[in-house]
A protein has these predicted regions:
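Extracellular/periplasmic solute-recognition and catalytic clefts
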Residues: 1-10, 33
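Short strand-loop junctions, especially beta-strand C-caps/beta-turns
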Residues: 7-11, 99-103, 130
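Short, hydrophobic alpha-helical packing/hinge segments within bilobed ligand-binding/sensory domains
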Residues: 9, 18-19, 31, 68, ...
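Append "and occasionally in soluble cytosolic enzymes with long acidic Gly/Pro-rich linkers
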Residues: 14-116, 212
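Extracytoplasmic/peripheral linker and loop segments enriched in polar/acidic and small residues
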Residues: 32, 125-136, 166-213
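Periplasmic binding protein-like
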Residues: 119-174
Length: 213
């Protein structure tokens, strides 16, 4: 499985409005058609599988370009330039670099479709297809010496990774995680919930904490 991960601390996606805009601009039916099997379903928000301990149901991902446009405007990108890209008050286009492991052919396909869809919507995407070592150095706390530079990346995740640490895929999100932490979330409320999950003595206590994520 794979997910589009944003760097929440640096660059374009430190603004939640722009993360939301991308979420609503993507066409999930196309991903299902081109990359899914006959049994594929459009996932819910978040990337935690429903079979994961602590899973809480969320709304299904939907495509809504009008809502995406509202989020772009909320972020200060109110007009488009001659190339069709949203620009802010300074005339700077909404653009980001999407990092992907070039050795993972399917992941490259995901990245290319994201680029195609977002540029049709009005966000410029620069693909950064690199080898494994360069990819890890841009997306992992361990291999970057806590200097993650990616703006967004295609992340592969595993069942083992989903359950590590405090579970629920938190190692991929927690900016303080020693190995992963690509999403660079340092929010105090998020850290407090992770502490609650860690301290849980019963499954009921764990689910109570998980419901707050």
């Amino acid at each position: 499985p794979a997910v589009l991960a944003f760097n929440n601390a640096k660059g374009l996606f430190s603004d939640e409005n722009l993360r939301q805009a991308v979420s609503y601009a993507l066409n999930y039916e196309e991903f299902k058609t081109y990359f899914g099997s006959a049994y594929a379903e459009i996932p819910n928000r978040g990337f935690v599988p429903s079979t994961t301990v602590g899973y809480t149901d969320t709304e299904k991902l939907t495509t809504d370009t009008a809502k995406a446009d509202e989020y772009m405007k909320a972020a200060g990108y109110t007009e488009k330039n001659a190339d069709g890209f949203y620009v802010n008050a300074d005339g700077a286009a909404a653009a980001f670099t999407l990092t992907v492991n070039a050795a993972k052919e399917t992941h490259v396909g995901y990245a290319e479709m994201i680029k195609t869809q977002l540029e049709a919507f009005g966000i410029q995407v620069n693909l950064d297809a690199v080898d494994k070592d360069a990819y890890n150095a841009k997306t992992s706390n361990k291999f970057s010496e806590n200097n993650i530079t990616m703006e967004a990346a295609i992340y592969g995740y595993t069942a083992a990774g989903m359950g590590m640490g405090n579970g629920l895929g938190s190692i991929y999100v927690d900016g303080n995680h020693a190995v992963q932490g690509g999403c660079q979330v340092f929010d105090e409320a998020f850290s407090s919930i992770l502490d609650e999950l860690k301290a849980a003595k019963t499954i009921e206590e764990y689910y109570t904490g998980a419901a707050k994520l």
